[in-house]
């Protein structure tokens, strides 16, 4: 009778629930670990027949190379984290895609998370990503104190802030010209005859909201217009709050004839309120929005290039990771006024 192979001579199989290892592949193919390593890493020195046997074992076992272990030996994880403010905000879609495209071009994986506009959640998420040894962070900040990141930055975690600057630390920041864009948008309304112009924006502690309000005030001052408190409203962007603000501006003793909306979430509610009015009210919105050109009239906007912001931030991040000695820089990208009709309506009275 043929001799029964000893247990140790039999090809081993991975235990249920465990990922197959190179040792499992070597046992199944009847070769050494070094041979499997050469095949997996595309190295020379393996005959075609041996390579075929190793590849068959890989396919049969479902083996996948452990890239995490490989990159950790090199001191990198080939991963970067992106901390967004609000995943539901359409502004962050093209921004996130642009960051991911740059990361992919550098062979890195992008890990997304949302702070939900909560500073504590932002800190928790950023530090959790650092604990998982991401090589770098791109952060849209919800808070205004980022000293908690100092130890991580000193440890070599590349960091770039987007849309708003960091607080309490010197770090790269890529953002739009919020002040200049708002100033241009309000000046556009003034140029079409408006003197009573309302401003509805996000919470004042948010950098973009305060800068856009500053642009509004400056444009009104440039035109010699004294702004009434009733014309300005900053706060949460939930529809109920924005609706109340818009209705009060439109029905008060000195009703506005035009509205400048501070972001696309505000704009959606403002459009609904204006559609219910018996008179036509001009509108310029900060941030473009989908289907804005299909409304009647089309919505005049101050457009940001979210993809360019994300791409610039990611390029900056990988330059840091590649060892470039860069001083922290604030990079402001220009906005663009797109006239579609709503911002060109004359005053109704």
Language-model segment annotations:
Residues 1-78, 347:
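N-terminal helix-turn-helix DNA-binding module of bacterial transcription factors
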Residues 1-15, 60, 101-106, 154-161, ...:
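Bacterial carbohydrate/catabolite-sensing allosteric modules
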Residues 28, 33-38, 72-88, 188, ...:
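Short beta-strand segments enriched in small/hydrophobic residues
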Residues 63-128, 132-136, 217, 221:
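Amphipathic helical "hinge" segments at domain boundaries
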Residues 69, 123-126, 149, 186, ...:
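Short hydrophobic/charged patches on amphipathic alpha-helices used for structural packing
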Residues 83, 138, 258-260:
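Structural motif
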Residues 116-119, 140-145, 264-265:
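Short beta->alpha connector loops
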Residues 136-149, 161-170:
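Acidic, Gly/Pro-rich loop/turn segments at junctions of secondary structure
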């Amino acid at each position: 009778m043929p001799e029964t192979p000893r247990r140790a001579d039999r090809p081993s199989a991975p235990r249920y629930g465990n990922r197959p290892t190179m040792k499992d592949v070597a046992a199944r193919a009847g070769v050494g670990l070094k041979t499997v390593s050469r095949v997996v890493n595309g190295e020379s020195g393996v005959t075609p027949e041996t390579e075929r046997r190793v590849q068959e074992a890989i396919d049969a076992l479902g083996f996948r190379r452990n890239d995490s272990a490989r990159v950790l030996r090199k001191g990198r994880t080939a991963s970067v984290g992106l901390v967004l403010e609000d995943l539901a905000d359409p502004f962050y879609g093209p921004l996130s895609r642009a960051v991911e495209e740059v990361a992919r071009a550098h062979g890195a994986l992008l890990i997304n998370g949302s702070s939900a506009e909560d500073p504590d959640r932002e800190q928790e998420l950023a530090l959790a990503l650092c604990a998982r040894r991401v090589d770098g962070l791109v952060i849209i900040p919800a808070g205004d104190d980022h000293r908690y990141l100092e130890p991580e930055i000193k440890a070599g975690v590349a960091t770039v802030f987007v849309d708003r600057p960091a607080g309490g630390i010197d770090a790269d920041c890529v953002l739009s010209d919020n002040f200049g864009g708002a100033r241009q948008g309000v000046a556009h309304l003034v140029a079409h005859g408006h003197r009573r112009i309302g401003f509805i924006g996000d919470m004042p502690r948010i950098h973009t909201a305060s800068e856009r309000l500053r642009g509004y005030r400056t444009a009104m001052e440039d035109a010699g217009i004294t702004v009434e408190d009733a014309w300005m409203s900053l706060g949460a962007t939930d529809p109920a709050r924005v609706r109340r603000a818009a209705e009060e501006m439109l029905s008060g003793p000195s009703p506005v004839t035009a509205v400048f909306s501070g972001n696309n979430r505000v704009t959606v509610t403002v459009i609904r309120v204006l559609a219910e009015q018996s008179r036509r009210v001009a509108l310029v919105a900060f941030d473009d929005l989908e289907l804005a050109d299909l409304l009647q009239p089309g919505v005049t906007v101050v457009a940001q290039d979210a993809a360019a912001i994300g791409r610039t931030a990611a390029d900056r991040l990988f330059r840091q990771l590649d060892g470039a000695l860069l001083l922290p820089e604030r990079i402001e990208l220009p906005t663009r006024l797109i006239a579609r009709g709503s911002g060109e309506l004359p005053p109704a009275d």
